[in-house]
Amino acid sequence: MFVDETGAATNMARRHGRRLRGHRLRCGVPHGHYKAITFVCGLRLRGVVAPKAYDRAMTAAMFEAWLERHLLPTLEEGDIVVLDNLQAHKSPRVAEILATKNCTVQYLPPYSPDFNPIEKAYSKLKAFLRKLAERTVPGLIAILESCADLFRQTECENFFAACGYDTT
C-alpha cells in the first residue's frame, strides 16, 4: 500500500482546448484568489482507500489522526505501508499506529516519484478535477473524498506495473 498527499485548488481548469479551424476557443479561466486543499489517500492494487481532504497544509498531527481514523480500518494484518519522505511521515507515532495491525513502514528514496504509483493516480485525479472545474471548497472536498470510484482495479494494477512493481 502506498500513501501520499497532493494538492488541489479551486482555480483548477483546463488550459488547452479544441475548436474548429477559424473559430476562437473561449472559456472562462479563474484568476486571482483561490483556496488550496490537501488530499491524502492510500493506493492498493485493488484501488484507492481512505480518501480524505483538508482545507489546510498537512501536519504530523493531522497525518497521524488520518492514519488512525481512516487508513487503519482498511489495513490488513502484515501490510507494508510505503511513504515518501514528507516530514509529517517521519513522526515516531506513525510506526506505532501501524504496528497495532502488524504493518511495517517503508520509506521511498528521496526525490523518487517514479517509484510511487500513487503519483500516476494523482495525475488522473487532477485531470478529472480540471475537467470538472469546481470553484467551491465544499464542492472540491466532496469530489475528492468520493474519488475512490474513479479508479478501477486494472487501472491501479497498471499504475504499479508502470513503476516496475510485480502485480501478480
Description of each model-found segment:
Residues 1-168:
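Short functional hotspots at interaction and active-site rims
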